[in-house]
């Protein structure tokens, strides 16, 4: 119970004891004390509480404090808590509780308070533990006293779910729905503010699953507001009214209901029918850096910081699981376009951010579309095709630079159809171009600006709210293009953000996020697009059924991978089955996350070729060989050939169809040979004929008789009872004179529908891959141009289990192109896959190093998996690790900050390099540590995120960021970046700069 009173007034009050603490033992001793107190216990004093500063929460109007709990000391009674304002000591709040924490509301903003806490037995109390605090001078963004009631009972109120956005549970059209299988923060605001503690119970369809003690409003998570805000701006909090608790991903599913219970037994419930769940969507984004006739730039920040960017972008998209993967970069030193053009030095085209023939044919069609197709088991497509064969939510983003007729050009700024072409993989370019892939156009709904009626975002890793306005931009109104609606700045201080598709913002707005917070209406459109994507479960493609809230089987013609999300080699190239355009295979690219399929093997490995005498064809030959057929009475029948001898001795070669049941080649009931007015059936002797395989080389022909000579074959593909095959003579497809069908000579003009006049051997095309053990894997690829005016492109994944050494493309007996494959050192630099969400949580981004400065230790190496945690500075054109060591002069010792230089394997020094030195008595002294005797700098600490990193002794670390100079130091009293006064640059001047950047934890 909380009592407020003036020392000048006498106030009587009832004492409320919270029965949370020592349970039955404590209760028993209390009962005993009421009738027969233990005299020895009456004189004993309990131990003094120890207040936990880390668990203190302060807002403008409330505070929560916590202290060490007394573990059921005999005759323990309660804690006394006394709160008073320093400038008005007559305003006192007294609380008597058995909880080891307390929430106090209705305090005065920007005021100094003191709290005394003592623990009491029935007879005596301990000395008080004291803590002082100042309530914040902050702005409560969600300050409205009105609530949207959706929790009913004696503890009614409002509940909101927080995932990518703060949303209502009912599922509104203008905001995302709750994501199944994703962690959530629950916010609860009681209608009446009289609760000191609230317990949240989580129920599923099977009953109670867990209980969570909610954090008081003063413990509500912080925002992404920069720490070094202007002194004229106050701290902004999301709200000072909501209780909060987290629910893990595996409890977030349909059928969940929530019960809220306070210390007085009041109960509020939101039933499962009022909580609308959407699909547990998954999203895969592949990332690759390209250079076309020019070396790749190596500036793809997503690839460099895969863990950080994956976790960051996860906060912006309504998915349950996000997978970021990286490919090894590709340097295209020679390029063959699908039209046959070959470049070895530069493109003949004019390149631009949005234009260039290589940009379209290589970056978008070959690489992004190719990688997407390879992960669906599609081995080839037409060379210029950018068709998005969307089944799963799989997108490939690339950065790309090319050498064109007008010089070296960086491409970027486009997205859609599973493709993203970027110059900058951070900020709004990424968010905007990915948005096009989700079906979003420019200026959704006429231009979407955040405003006072749109929700904030949430970062589940840093556990901070993301504001929907710009923290640093000067205040101004946003005006919607379509209806001129004006959105004024929040409190006339902060400009509201535009959605990514309406301009967004090209800077890091707060202290944690480098991607754009989508407007909730736009986020809902994204969610609706994503939930239609299939996932692979138990060797089947499955899609989410919103009515049943489960995954159900999806029928599709796409292959299901035999291995999902495994290391792969992706083979890309261009080939022309017609052997007109040149073909080219490119150096393979590698990823740690791709799909492997049981790809079609070439028929030629087990298939017979050409005309085959039926007695020589066994069962396996029949099964493994692809045979030419013709249409007979709407049924495909195998074409066959035999030597026919008429009753009067006329001999010719006849093309018919195989009657497999009777093992003859026949013309059937409708075709006969007319001789002397008599109709003679045309059929072979038993098992004495030839079948025609699809495989072979060149055009297919036969000799009807010696007078006609060798002729190309033709056949009919007509509905009804008209059928047959023959030879081409002049402008007709015909048989030997005398062969009739339905009373007419068997002859048809070539140009009419249903006459197939082009028969060629298949000339099968095969991709052959040889591994280091000389094993060869052969994969069938199309033996025809998919589009008649261009070459095909190859895109397929194979396993990385064994290194490959050769790749060849054959069509028939002709080798079209080949490439020898050498070891790729970039494979060791791959970081992916980074999987965020569901059971993976944020484990891929948890720090592996201590925070701040730490001593070098044995076997420490700045390996690929931790180098993103280490602070870096620019030295000439390289990013070098920041380090610090103690430098001793004869009369003093100081800290020097330099960069790490590797001497040999596992041996490092911290140095100032050749340009920075210590000057004493006109002598330049080199600045270098002893071997492995220095400190590294870790810049990862989510609890200190946004805080400036110290140089030493409360001095702020600063780093130069230009090409002319390098180094790091601290900010002096004049806000200049410097080190000790005797540290100089090579030009003889003191190392002292007014242009620099400060470093913060992330």
From Swiss-Prot:
PANTHER family cross-referenced by the UniProt entry: DICTOMALLEIN-1-RELATED, PTHR39540
Record carries keyword Cell membrane: yes
Region described as Disordered: 31-53
Listed name of the protein: ToxR-activated gene A lipoprotein
GO biological process: proteolysis
Reported cofactor(s): Zn(2+)
Pfam families: fn3, Peptidase_M66, TagA
Single Gene Ontology MF annotation: metal ion binding
